[in-house]
């Protein structure tokens, strides 16, 4: 798992670039690490803890996936053929669609957290990391970037191990609080992002995978918030 840290977090450790694509199965294991600081903020109930928790999360994960979300949204929303959409996604300038997507994801997370228990971000991050694994498992790369490199290492064994690990980390929480299962709604959002990416671009690159991660997390928090509000104990 150590080799994943430099590529998916800001945690200052060295990783082996040659080995990382063979350890993608461990992506769900990153969730306890990436959500730890944010979960602590929520547990301590600090003033503006919902905002501080999201800032703590991005302090840990970095903004690379959020940047990918902006690029992805620009590409999806532009009118035209596939070539034009890919060109818009790769444009260094962020358009209004990208700005809107980033703001909406940020606000959905910030305003969902006050309605949820302190461990909600852990569940959202767990689903986010698993959704990234599912995106890589499509093995339909767009271009020859880092996403394509990771996809080359994906296989059935890694997906099976990753799924087992995901369930191992999810089910104990769901046993204690059954409503935690509602976090899986985030996976539906992530699956829709994968579908949109394949339809608009014909494959997935790092920007698409970043969008999957961000939208899955926001979708998980939103889904849980709805369930907690309407099915609260």
Curated annotation (Swiss-Prot):
It is an enzyme of class 2 (transferase). It is a multi-pass membrane protein. Disulfide bonds: none annotated. InterPro entries: CobS. Keywords: Cell membrane, Cobalamin biosynthesis, Magnesium, Membrane, Transferase, Transmembrane, Transmembrane helix. Its EC number is 2.7.8.26. Its main location: membrane. The chain crosses the membrane at residues 24-44, 46-66, 96-116, 117-137, 158-178, 181-198, 209-229. Joins adenosylcobinamide-GDP and alpha-ribazole to generate adenosylcobalamin (Ado-cobalamin). Also synthesizes adenosylcobalamin 5'-phosphate from adenosylcobinamide-GDP and alpha-ribazole 5'-phosphate. NCBIfam families: cobS (TIGR00317). Belongs to the CobS family. This is Adenosylcobinamide-GDP ribazoletransferase. It comes from Thermococcus gammatolerans (strain DSM 15229 / JCM 11827 / EJ3). The lineage of its organism: Archaea, Methanobacteriati, Methanobacteriota, Thermococci, Thermococcales.
